Curated annotation (Swiss-Prot):
Record PTM Phosphothreonine, positions in chain: 299
EC number, UniProt record: 2.7.2.3
Recorded metabolic or biological pathway in which this protein acts: Carbohydrate degradation; glycolysis; pyruvate from D-glyceraldehyde 3-phosphate: step 2/5
Source organism per UniProt: Geobacillus kaustophilus (strain HTA426)
Name of the protein in question: Phosphoglycerate kinase
Gene: pgk
Gene Ontology cellular-component annotations: cytosol
Predominant localisation class: cytoplasm
CDD domains, A to Z: Phosphoglycerate_kinase
Catalysed reactions, as listed in the record: (2R)-3-phosphoglycerate + ATP = (2R)-3-phospho-glyceroyl phosphate + ADP
Binding of ATP, residues: 201, 323, 350-353
Phosphoserine modification, residue list: 183
Annotated GO MF terms: ADP binding; ATP binding; phosphoglycerate kinase activity
UniProt key word Acetylation: no
Family membership: Belongs to the phosphoglycerate kinase family.
Amino acid sequence: MNKKTIRDVEVRGKRVFCRVDFNVPMEQGAITDDTRIRAALPTIRYLIEHGAKVILASHLGRPKGKVVEELRLDAVAKRLGELLERPVAKTNEAVGDEVKAAVDRLNEGDVLLLENVRFYPGEEKNDPELAKAFAELADLYVNDAFGAAHRAHASTEGIAHYLPAVAGFLMEKELEVLGKALSNPDRPFTAIIGGAKVKDKIGVIDNLLEKVDNLIIGGGLAYTFVKALGHDVGKSLLEEDKIELAKSFMEKAKEKGVRFYMPVDVVVADRFANDANTKVVAIDAIPSDWEALDIGPKTRELYRDVIRQSKLVVWNGPMGVFEMEAFAHGTKAIAEALAEAPDTYSVIGGGDSAAAVEKFGLADKMDHISTGGGASLEFMEGKQLPGVVALEDK
């Protein structure tokens, strides 16, 4: 990675504005999953141990530039304090006199969490005035919020124009793992692309076809490819306007010598419900009034074999409607194959795939789970991420 990190700069005695991603799921004011808070701990601990005055900033949810009481970060500050085993001060604003006074009170090794930055309309607009106000609080900017790196916001990109800007450890790890996968992968390199819609994965499929040895397709988006081969898909998810594109992807795979794997059998249901009637049918035998909601057992076995033979697997998107028990078997089989394959380095591309490995209790068996759904997707599309571009080069 050619970006400076906190290791490359002196932090002792400095006021460090550290953008983290504490956008955690909440229910009735309680945090239901603190993974994102834990992910930022190495950077925060490093700053504390090296005598920085730590100012943390994050968003939570989508308050749309207004104060939304249930999206305040008080519960986050409390949980962070428990994890760090030290008090974490919190302000009720993210800029202004109260914040300046709180920053002035910080000693070396102290931690202050600012209020939700998305309470300010200028955050998502990347307003230079707000970015300057953030920058005035500090001597150094650290971005450790890979999950928000694809957004050019005031606290992720704008602020970096006014302060020396470096990466935190989580940002560094994400860029190294994903960067190596795209630029210098161990082979055979397999990408597994699932999820509901082709349109969300066009850029990823297009970019990965230049790089992978095997491409595995599953989830709702698979049926547009099945239709492109001339098979009837019944009531399965179908994007009519993407059929030609699906054909062109299969052509491109052939030209590039990429092995393109699609379901050979599927689990179909007579309606979209966990207690629907289901059966397994061959891919060219989907009944006209049924819909395919998961990959079938033969496909699971086929995909498992490909995974076992791969040195690197990047997985983005589930194989079926894994939220429903009846249609979770395909996604679970992929997660288990990745967990069990001894020589396979597994990179889980955030979002639903990350949620799935968590759900099946296999998260600790994965080599790298990306903390950014949208960010990792855009990175795998080959796009430049504004929050990364803004950091200083080594």
